[in-house]
Amino acid sequence: MKDLGGLMKQAQAMQQKLADAQARLAELTVEGTSGGGMVTVTLRGNGELAKVVLDESLIEPGEGEVIADLIVAAHADAKKKLDAQQAQLMQEAAGPMAGMMGGLPGMKF
């Protein structure tokens, strides 16, 4: 029974670490860029698009398609960075138990 009690304590500690990591993720913001910095997008920790900044040189007639492509590319860049930071935070929170949890739904490690 001592082992079960220890396991329960470990599970509770990990649950708290994961809750803390999720709180940090909620506060996280990342930027992605494209076009050599002509387009910058900011994503929140939940993946929500928070901001788009366009270089003034893009705002000319006939540039709509280019702008749209650059926004999509900047968003993809930001999403890639966000996914990496989320995975790192969750890996840190789970510690040595991360390998055992990799197959659980909603857990990216």
UniProtKB/Swiss-Prot annotation:
Pfam families according to UniProt: YbaB_DNA_bd
One GO term describing the cellular component: bacterial nucleoid
Top-level taxon: Bacteria
Keyword set, alphabetical order: Cytoplasm, DNA-binding
InterPro entries, sorted: YbaB-like_sf (IPR036894), YbaB/EbfC (IPR004401)
Cell compartments where the protein resides: Cytoplasm, Nucleoid
Gene Ontology molecular function, alphabetical: DNA binding
Known function: Binds to DNA and alters its conformation. May be involved in regulation of gene expression, nucleoid organization and DNA protection.
Protein family: Belongs to the YbaB/EbfC family.
Complex formation: Homodimer.
HAMAP family, per the entry: DNA_YbaB_EbfC
Name of the featured protein: Nucleoid-associated protein Caul_4574
Source species of the chain: Caulobacter sp. (strain K31)
